[in-house]
Amino acid sequence: MESLLLARLPEAYVVFSPLVDVFPVIPVFFLLLAFVWQAAVGFR
């Protein structure tokens, strides 16, 4: 389905395809950020 969606995108959006590849990593990044923040405040 994802390849079908990317195939339908206009030529202008081809530039953003590397950005779309990064999107699934963002929730993991926020989870790590929350963990680091809790470690910084001492797990209150």
Swiss-Prot record:
SUPFAM superfamilies: Photosystem II reaction center protein K, PsbK (SSF161037). PSII is composed of 1 copy each of membrane proteins PsbA, PsbB, PsbC, PsbD, PsbE, PsbF, PsbH, PsbI, PsbJ, PsbK, PsbL, PsbM, PsbT, PsbX, PsbY, PsbZ, Psb30/Ycf12, at least 3 peripheral proteins of the oxygen-evolving complex and a large number of cofactors. It forms dimeric complexes. One of the components of the core complex of photosystem II (PSII). PSII is a light-driven water:plastoquinone oxidoreductase that uses light energy to abstract electrons from H(2)O, generating O(2) and a proton gradient subsequently used for ATP formation. It consists of a core antenna complex that captures photons, and an electron transfer chain that converts photonic excitation into a charge separation. Keywords: Chloroplast, Membrane, Photosynthesis, Photosystem II, Plastid, Reaction center, Thylakoid, Transmembrane, Transmembrane helix. The chain crosses the membrane at residues 23-43. This is Photosystem II reaction center protein K. GO terms for biological process: photosynthesis. The keyword Iron-sulfur does not apply. It is a single-pass membrane protein. NCBIfam families: PRK02553.1. It comes from Thalassiosira pseudonana. Its main location: plastid.
